[in-house]
Amino acid sequence: MSNRKYFGTDGIRGRVGNAPITPDFVLKLGWAAGKVLARHGSRKIIIGKDTRISGYMLESALEAGLAAAGLSASFTGPMPTPAVAYLTRTFRAEAGIVISASHNPFYDNGIKFFSIDGTKLPDDVEEAIEAEMEKEITCVDSAELGKASRIVDAAGRYIEFCKGTFPNELSLNGLKVVVDCANGATYHIAPNVLRELGATVIAIGCEPNGVNINEEVGATDVRALQARVLAEKADLGIALDGDGDRVIMVDHEGNKVDGDQIMYIIAREGLRQGQLRGGAVGTLMSNMGLELALKQLGIPFSRAKVGDRYVLEKLQEKGWRIGAENSGHVILLDKTTTGDGIVAGLQVLAAMVRNHMSLHDLCSGMKMFPQILVNVRYTAGSGDPLENEAVKAVTADVEATLGNRGRVLLRKSGTEPLIRVMVEGEDEAQVTAFAHRIADAVKAV
């Protein structure tokens, strides 16, 4: 990815009004993508967005660029990222485009592409789009210009898809669920899915105004959800992020249930039902408790680099079906092609109903290890702290002390001059002290 000028691991993202998230850039991106995608034959593109106010501006720019290249755009309106992937497949569109910055604040936005099969665009297509970006815009003949239309039943189609991933013989009757939609793209989807499956639903974070997406709500901040679950005496809470590709849950006691625990529940249930193919993929940040719990069940476990893109690559490499990040990206390849918060949440609910167990009890087979993360800022250009001998020595000493009952992970942030120091083990006081000891060594570089 290092030779890319615009595309990162998750499309193109930035602050609105600053390059590259400007109207003129996005118009040209639409044109360049249109030129490349038109070579493949189909001339239909699906465009969805989350609830950021800048989405209106950016979808108009994309539409203009695509039309100039001769491609027609079909708009879904606010729609979760996994819904756009699904609709791209079912409409046999050449590509799907999502305008979203996921869990970021409203003043950020981004552009992400899906291919005709609902997966990420191949690298060679992204590279071809970047090459077109270097050319001057030329407009096709007037008779060949693209058109724009709306998919009026997009939400209904996706709601039915989500419900179809929940076992027909089960229902959510009798369950009280609080769902937090982060004032994002699932606000008109998730509550309806749960209600139509029989649950009593209390919805929060479902009043988007263009600037409140992810603001003290959603998968990145579950405090409001925890409080509401306790106040309503609900059976559980479900928190989605701004574009609906992450899910974090809350049990009836108000305890947070993260992506590692969600994957454990789904993998164990798959094993019980005889439906688990192969093992499970986590990341370098996945809790050691997950690895040990899966090992006890005889389920193979593999770690990918941090990022749902790398989880998906590892799943494809191994031919496995289930992967997750502790941040709540859960990928279930037997159900969908990308991380889907609603679909993952439904599989946990199915396990609860089928086993007559609370979410709290479903998590009890996995003991979470204390995991301490310290971010240390360093001066870019002053040498690599990870190659420093003193840092290496302290890290080796901590690893030797922890043995096979803990882990140390040092990695650079992909976006800032930060070293992330993570120490994990059985004793919280010990791992906290170890994390700060390593962090102090990094600071001294």
Swiss-Prot record:
InterPro entries: A-D-PHexomutase_a/b/a-I, A-D-PHexomutase_a/b/a-I/II/III, A-D-PHexomutase_a/b/a-II, A-D-PHexomutase_a/b/a-III, A-D-PHexomutase_C, A-D-PHexomutase_C_sf, A-D-PHexomutase_CS, Alpha-D-phosphohexomutase_SF. Activated by phosphorylation. Binds 1 Mg(2+) ion per subunit. The active site is at S102 (phosphoserine intermediate). Keywords: Isomerase, Magnesium, Metal-binding, Phosphoprotein. It comes from the Bacteria. SUPFAM superfamilies: Phosphoglucomutase, C-terminal domain, Phosphoglucomutase, first 3 domains. The modification Phosphoserine is found at S102. Mg(2+) binds at S102, D241, D243, D245. GO terms for cellular component: cytosol. PROSITE patterns: PGM_PMM (PS00710). Its cofactor is Mg(2+). The keyword Nucleotide-binding does not apply. The keyword Cytoplasm does not apply. Its EC number is 5.4.2.10. GO terms for molecular function: magnesium ion binding; phosphoglucosamine mutase activity; phosphomannomutase activity. Pfam families: PGM_PMM_I (PF02878), PGM_PMM_II (PF02879), PGM_PMM_III (PF02880), PGM_PMM_IV (PF00408). One of its GO terms (biological process) is UDP-N-acetylglucosamine biosynthetic process. Belongs to the phosphohexose mutase family. This is Phosphoglucosamine mutase.
